[in-house]
């Protein structure tokens, strides 16, 4: 049963293009189904989380990360009586705007296109799902509901300086950018933090970049490791680690739920409008846990994301993205025909740079590497002619 402050499908603010209702599925269920069957969602399978999937099939990708975020977010939504379908849709789609190599690729596009365009993956997701999916005859894109679009644009909170893509959607739909997002969107942001803080640790261990001993000194997960080592002295390190991560995720989920319930009770939040009008997020980590999460994130940044071998990869991968941009921007006839035609008639350097970013953002890790080889490999292959 949905709580009064959840997002009710029958009260949705609708879609940009009017459609008939489905007699069997509500509007948020249709959003989720459209997303899952989209090519943009499938491409997440071949985009980096921390370690490139090209190097090892066992590392998480943007797809597996998004599935884990969705599972955690649905668990929180269920405990709070929120709309699980809307929550799941926002969670599954939240990383679709990432270019190849994820944050590394985003940094590269931001640097190389800076003179003409500001690339931002949180905004790019709206462009990809709103323009670059072509399954429907009556409109471009997936024609998602207002609540899904609002959640994707604002799941990290109100926006003071919106990206031009978000400004365009705001002009069409009035996304109330100065207000808090729905509680469904808020918990996706927290579920994202929970997922990568716990699962990036797992990939770090798998890679050997971080060690079991490193984790024993961290808050939350380290406390659980020490506890389970004493409770299960015969267990292997991998068994202790798996149980400690499970307990960490559960602990963080309950912390978010407790804070949200306390805020709902204290501030008499009865409707989704009350959630949006509140001057701060109704869902969050408690103060103590928030500090501990920052400590875990700092550990991951210092010991995993910027580890020397990963830093070496960052240099190479950023170079791939930057050089692809330079080729396509200065020689647009190298773009696929449909992109080239749009580039040719674009009336500003901003729009031209945006189109090149669009093309690159739709590439997977492996397709970006293949494109780069076609231009920069020293090997001349017969099939290139």
From Swiss-Prot:
It comes from the Bacteria. This is Deoxyguanosinetriphosphate triphosphohydrolase-like protein. One of its GO terms (biological process) is dGTP catabolic process. One of its GO terms (molecular function) is dGTPase activity. Disulfide bonds: none annotated. Residues 62-197 form the HD domain. PANTHER family: DEOXYGUANOSINETRIPHOSPHATE TRIPHOSPHOHYDROLASE-LIKE PROTEIN, DEOXYNUCLEOSIDE TRIPHOSPHATE TRIPHOSPHOHYDROLASE.
